Amino acid sequence: MTALRALICVLALALAPGAANADTARIAVASNFTSAAKALADEYAALSGHAITPSYGATGALYLQISQGAPYAAFLAADQARPALLLQDDRAVPGSGFTYAIGELALFSRDAAAVLGPDYLKQAPFERIAIADPATAPYGLAAMQTLQSLGLDAVLAPRIVRGKNIGQTFQFIWSGAAEAGFVARSQIADAGAGAHWTVPSSLHEPIAQDAVLLDASSVAARGFLAYLRSPAGRATISRHGYATPE
């Protein structure tokens, strides 16, 4: 059976009117994907009757929870490495991994008059700049790679404040705890104010985000992952500021 036919079959089972009893699945979701995941969960629930309960956090922290037995039915990471490790360690359903979104990094300031870009970082007209923890958050790692590419990582190190995930990092900027910081471009659309610079992908490694199924018995989780790959799901992901794989 081809991947496309398998996807159609899973969606047909999950979305069929009156199909089985309504199921609920707890899903681990990288913080940067919060808004998109909420929209996708609502759409999927309306179509299928199945409920998706997302739990948000840094990819590394969620991976650790899953490795220690946390009862998630699926994992939407902000990288490819952690889902691959779960597959390698037989903690995920074989063959279930796929790239659901490709993210973009942005430098963001709540000050709409700020002119952001490499010169802003070099001139450093700020006391604090926020990034997510590079050890656990892929967008934080991409931020550090950007500073390294610009030769500014050592110079700016004393001014860096680290959020435990990209959601907290955004809050640092929005609250004024940091004048600027690196976030997911998708978060900026929800802000409705401020200035931003979309970081060229040449300055950091690609932010390909993979999903993996953890509980093969979860009808809701299997259907939800299939929905992410459907035309409707991909359109929602695109509307929230992500590219989707061909």
Predicted regions and their residues:
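Basic, amphipathic juxtamembrane/active-site segments
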Residues: 94
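Sec/Tat signal peptide C-region and signal peptidase I cleavage site
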Residues: 18-22
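Exported/periplasmic ABC-transporter solute-binding proteins
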Residues: 23-55, 60-68, 75-80, 84-90, ...
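Bacterial N-terminal signal peptides
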Residues: 5-16
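Short, flexible coil/linker elements and helix-boundary hinge sites characteristic
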Residues: 16-17, 49
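N-terminal secretory signal peptides that target proteins for export/translocation
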Residues: 1-3
